[in-house]
């Protein structure tokens, strides 16, 4: 098997993965992951079923569906007074982890430093390193 890039030598196993493994082994309660313990709202389930039945199975534009970006823009303005252009100021990602690395890659230059305040999500340091920065804890 090909060796991993040297940059990965500074990374450790995910604490979340480690705690999950331990909980599974001893039958404990896993508090390290966010497992929703509630049903999805009926309207969301119905919308998903409708989309599947109507053949909505293609990739969207890479920065998110226009209707969703427009809705986010309206909510940002209504709730926070922030005016943002849904065409140029909003990108929809598959989750916070993707958003975080994409943002850091966009704003960090090699040699920059980032300050990571505790407590922190375990990806902050590795994402900073992958972006060329040195994390300071």
Locate each region found by the language model.
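Basic/polar N-terminal segments that are highly enriched at the extreme N-terminus
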Residues: 1-4
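N-terminal small-domain helix-loop-helix segment of the aminotransferase-like
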Residues: 6-95, 102
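Short capping loops/turns at secondary-structure boundaries
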Residues: 96-97, 117
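PLP-dependent aminotransferase-like
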Residues: 106-137
């Amino acid at each position: 098997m090909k060796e991993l890039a040297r940059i990965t030598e500074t990374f450790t196993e995910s604490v979340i993965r480690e705690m999950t493994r331990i909980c599974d082994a001893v039958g404990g309660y896993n508090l390290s992951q966010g497992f929703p313990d509630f049903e999805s709202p009926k309207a969301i389930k119905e919308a998903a079923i409708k989309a599947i039945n109507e053949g909505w199975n293609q990739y969207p534009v890479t920065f998110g569906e226009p209707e969703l970006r427009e809705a986010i823009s309206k909510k940002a303005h209504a709730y926070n007074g922030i005016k943002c252009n849904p065409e140029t100021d909003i990108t929809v990602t598959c989750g916070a982890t993707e958003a975080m690395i994409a943002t850091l890659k966009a704003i960090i230059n090699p040699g920059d430093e980032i300050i990571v305040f505790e407590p922190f999500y375990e990806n902050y340091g590795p994402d900073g390193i992958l972006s060329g920065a040195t994390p300071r804890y």
